Amino acid sequence: MKILVIQGPNLNMLGHRDPRLYGMVTLDQIHEIMQTFVKQGNLDVELEFFQTNFEGEIIDKIQESVGSDYEGIIINPGAFSHTSIAIADAIMLAGKPVIEVHLTNIQAREEFRKNSYTGAACGGVIMGFGPLGYNMALMAMVNILAEMKAFQEAQQNNPNNPINNQK
């Protein structure tokens, strides 16, 4: 299975940006940790990473995933979580599972950070666990996709399914 990981604005500055909140781990290290998690778990997963500081590029990347071989999206939209209805709309039209990740617990931060338009459009939100949150999202995504596949196979093999009885 192929999973797209989208990283939003300022995440390229992890390791330098407010270490008290975000720690010293860089974005590249987070991606390496995710790849190691895939290998150690013998998961049949291919990850593609994309980072941008531009809202439109995030929307473009989500739209490019429509009809592609990406089965799911893990996204940290950064500050766009609190402002971007356009990214939320793109998430809703993606037609695949999307999980939002935040390194910090946005509910415990400034009032303006507590609302997440994008999180409301996602199947789930993982926040406050630092870099571990990405592996948590990855684990959830793998399970969601496996359940979806099992359900589809069960539907295809069900002799009572009217679609299977068409001639």
Curated annotation (Swiss-Prot):
Its EC number is 4.2.1.10. It catalyses: 3-dehydroquinate = 3-dehydroshikimate + H2O. The keyword Amino-acid biosynthesis applies. Keywords: Amino-acid biosynthesis, Aromatic amino acid biosynthesis, Lyase. InterPro entries: DHquinase_II, DHquinase_II_CS, DHquinase_II_sf. PANTHER family: CATABOLIC 3-DEHYDROQUINASE. Catalyzes a trans-dehydration via an enolate intermediate. Homododecamer. This is 3-dehydroquinate dehydratase. It comes from Helicobacter pylori (strain Shi470).
